[in-house]
Structure formats: structure tokens, C-alpha cells
Amino acid sequence: MESGSNSTSCPMAFAGDNSDGPMCPMMMMMPPIMTSHQHHGHDHQHQQQEHDGYAYQSHHQQSSSLFLQSLAPPQGTKNKVASSSSPSSCAPAYSLMEIHHNEIVAGGINPCSSSSSSASVKAKIMAHPHYHRLLAAYVNCQKVGAPPEVVARLEEACSSAAAAAASMGPTGCLGEDPGLDQFMEAYCEMLVKYEQELSKPFKEAMVFLQRVECQFKSLSLSSPSSFSGYGETAIDRNNNGSSEEEVDMNNEFVDPQAEDRELKGQLLRKYSGYLGSLKQEFMKKRKKGKLPKEARQQLLDWWSRHYKWPYPSEQQKLALAESTGLDQKQINNWFINQRKRHWKPSEDMQFVVMDATHPHHYFMDNVLGNPFPMDHISSTML
């Protein structure tokens, strides 16, 4: 290991969707490599200290449900682990312990001490004073853009992990293990930067969305002339054209339900005239179907009483229209269809129809003044 500066920057990257739940891993790069200004003669001791720092990270993953998972390999070991199998989306891509294990094996160092000290390393990480800070920083990263139910599960998992750490015994003190202190401090700072970089574009997107919504609403309310004509009666009836509809451009958050109600009111005021005309057209089309049951029954009663000569006069048609609520055209069509389907004049009536001057049949009183339709004439009459 070469000596260098302690302030080494590290790029940040995430993968996965926070909406999948609190257990979904967070992809991260390697933490800042901890270096020392010690003499080159102590390289082996410094390498062992760095190895312990990475071992703290690996066993911290096993101690809590909030894993710092899916860690990408450092740049120097990328080729060494290229042949490893690809993990699933919710499993670590590379374990720091495995990466460092490969480095140690490649350098001829015995890795047995790292595996035998796993329990003590885990206990040291969970007992470190910065453990709660590390959990909180990780949860804050996962909270960015997450739905409320996921945020609640994250907070619950963080509380459970903190309680598990507290149950293991008293916490340690800073300075007992400088390597662990440096490791925890570096990761906490990294996660805080992650959270800041994630929050910035999310907040900018929310502000942009709210600005566009306000512009759309201002455009819809800035042209009252478009509401004139067919929309004026609706405005007077609803009495909603007040200053309460003005848009506050400084509001950061807008109630979605309030926007829906406002949009519904605007559409009703603007298109109420069209809606009324459409309703009338639908009613007309509905009237073209079957006649109402009560009106049809009245027409059948009249038909049964005048079955011998079912030709109502104009006065009778007007009376039927008034009693049934139908118009005269509907009554005429009903009688025409009824006669075609259910009435055939008798032989005597056929003679009367052909001899319009017959003086003895009282049914012909109105025939000369108002000739009846020819729909009832059968083939025998021709």
C-alpha cells in the first residue's frame, strides 16, 4: 500500500427501485480507501488494518436487516472477480470480504484469521458509537422518492436493527479501534453525500412538475371569454366564478383532490350547454323505441272499443295524445302498424269502404271530409 491523502473521493451509484421495499439492496461503490502517512516499513501492518476495516463492513451486512448490499469491486480487483457468477437483484454483487480474500490469497497471505474473527468483528461494528448514524444514513438514502408505506417499513426495520444492536451490550468508545472509527466515519459521510445527491434531482423534478401544473391552471383561468355563450348560464347557476379559483403560484404542494374538483367544475361550466343538448338527443332516441307501457295500454283500450273501425278522427287523436303524452305522429304510426298486423275488415266493412256514399253506416260520417289512409285496403278490395 502506498501512502497518500486521507480525503479520497468516491463516485456514487445506485440500482434498484426503492418502491420494492426496505429489503431491496443499494448498489454502492467501494468506500474511500483508508491510507496512512506511516513509513513504508509498516505496509504489512497497514494492509492488515485495511483488511479488518473491510471485514467490519462485511459482518455489518450480516448483523442487520438493512444491508449495505451489492457492493461493486474496487478498480484494482475488477479483473480478479470477473469470472464470478452474476447474483440476483436482491443479493450482494460482490462481498467486500470475498474481494479482500482474493487479494490476500493472491498476495500469499493466510486468510484464516479473518474467518475466525467474524463474530468479534460483527460485535464491534454493532457496538460502535457510529452504528446508529450509519443505519440512519442508509435509511435516508432509501427514503428518497419512496412511497409512504415503504418509508414506514424502512423506519421500522431501522428501529429493529438499532434495538438489536442495543441488546448486544454497552457501546464502545471512539479511539479504541482507529481503523474501525475511520471506516465508520467514511461510510457515514459517503451515505450522507448519496442522500444529498439523490434528493437534489428529486426535489427539482417536483418543483418543475408543480410549476407546469400552475401554468396549465393559469392558462385555463386566464381566458374568461372562452366561457361566454354556452357556458354563461352554467356559471350563473353554479355561482362558482369567484376569486377562490385563482392559482397561487407560490404554493409548493397542491392537493390532488382539490385540483380534480376544480377541473370538474371548469369542465361543467364550459360544456354544460353541450351536455344539455346531448341529453335531449339521447331522450329523443329513447323515445323512438317502444312506447311507454301506460300509453300503449290506453291505445289498446281505444283499439278494443273501436275494433270494427279503428280509424280515430283528428279530435280523437288529439285526445289520445293529451292523455298518453305522445305526439300525433307517434299515435298515427301506432295505429298504422296495429291495423297492418292485427286488423282485417269484414266483408260488410269492405263493401262500406268501397261505397263511400253508403247512407246507412254511421262509421262513414267523417270519411268524406278526412279520407282514411289506404294501409287497411286488402287484396280483396282491389
Curated annotation (Swiss-Prot):
GO cellular component: cytoplasm; endosome; microtubule cytoskeleton; nucleus; plasma membrane; plasmodesma
The ELK domain, residue ranges: 262-282
GO terms under biological process: carpel development; cytokinin biosynthetic process; floral meristem determinacy; plasmodesmata-mediated intercellular transport; regulation of meristem structural organization; stem cell population maintenance
MF GO annotations: DNA binding; DNA-binding transcription factor activity; DNA-binding transcription factor activity, RNA polymerase II-specific; protein homodimerization activity; RNA binding
Expressed in which tissues: Expressed in all four types of shoot apical meristems (SAM) i.e. in vegetative, axillary, inflorescence and floral.
Keyword terms of this UniProt record: Cell junction, Cell membrane, Cytoplasm, Developmental protein, DNA-binding, Endosome, Homeobox, Membrane, Nucleus, RNA-binding
Annotated signal peptide: none
Chain segments carrying region Disordered: 26-59
DNA-binding residues: 283-346
InterPro entries in UniProt: ELK_dom, HD, Homeobox_CS, Homeodomain-like_sf, KN_HD, KNOX1, KNOX2, TALE_homeobox
Feature: compositional bias, Basic and acidic residues: 44-53
PROSITE patterns: ELK, HOMEOBOX_1, HOMEOBOX_2
Main subcellular location of this protein, as a coarse class: nucleus
Compartments in which it is found: Nucleus; Cell junction, Plasmodesma; Cytoplasm; Endosome
tRNA processing keyword on record: no
Family: Belongs to the TALE/KNOX homeobox family.
Role: Required for shoot apical meristem (SAM) formation during embryogenesis. Negatively regulates ASYMMETRIC LEAVES1 (AS1) and ASYMMETRIC LEAVES2 (AS2 or LBD6). Probably binds to the DNA sequence 5'-TGAC-3'. Binds to RNA.
The protein's assembly and partners: Forms homodimers. May form heterodimeric complexes with TALE/BELL proteins BEL1, BLH2, BLH3, BLH8/PNF, BLH9/PNY and ATH1. Interacts with CCT8. Binds to MBP2C; this interaction reduces RNA binding capacity. Interacts with FTIP3 and FTIP4.
Name of the protein: Homeobox protein SHOOT MERISTEMLESS
Organism of this sequence: Arabidopsis thaliana (Mouse-ear cress)
Organism lineage string: Eukaryota, Viridiplantae, Streptophyta, Embryophyta, Tracheophyta
Gene name in the database record: STM
